[in-house]
UniProtKB/Swiss-Prot annotation:
Domain of life of the organism encoding this protein: Bacteria
Entry keyword Zinc: yes
InterPro entries: HypA/HybF
Any one GO molecular function term: zinc ion binding
Alphabetic keyword roster: Metal-binding, Nickel, Zinc
Protein name per the record: Hydrogenase maturation factor HypA
Function: Involved in the maturation of [NiFe] hydrogenases. Required for nickel insertion into the metal center of the hydrogenase.
Pfam families, sorted: HypA
Amino acid sequence: MHEMSLMGGVFEAIEATLAHHHVKKVLLVKLKIGQLTNAEPDALQMAFAAFAQGTVCEGAELQIEMLPVKGRCRSCSEEFMVPGLIFACPVCQHLGIDITQGEELLLESLEVEE
C-alpha cells in the first residue's frame, strides 16, 4: 500500500505550508492526483485519517481530484488524452509522447481555522 508513503509526503507539504502560520485546525485538504500514480482514493482516505490523528488535520475533510493521463506527441505536437494507457498519438500513431498530466501528486489547497 504505497498510499501511506504518498500521504507521508502530503503531510510534509502540509507541515511546511503551515510552519509560519498560527492555525488552530485544518478543515479541508484538496489534492490533485494523477492516474499514473496508481493511488487508490479509498486507501488515501485511510492513510490521511491515520496521519491526521493527533494533529491539526484531525477531523479535516480530504477531497481528491483524480487527473486523467494526457500526452503530447513528439512528432506532430498533438495534445491528447491517453485512453486506456495506449501511449501512441491518435493523429500520426507515433509512439514517442511526453506525458503532460497524470503523474502529479499536488497539494492544491488547505482551508484552515486560525
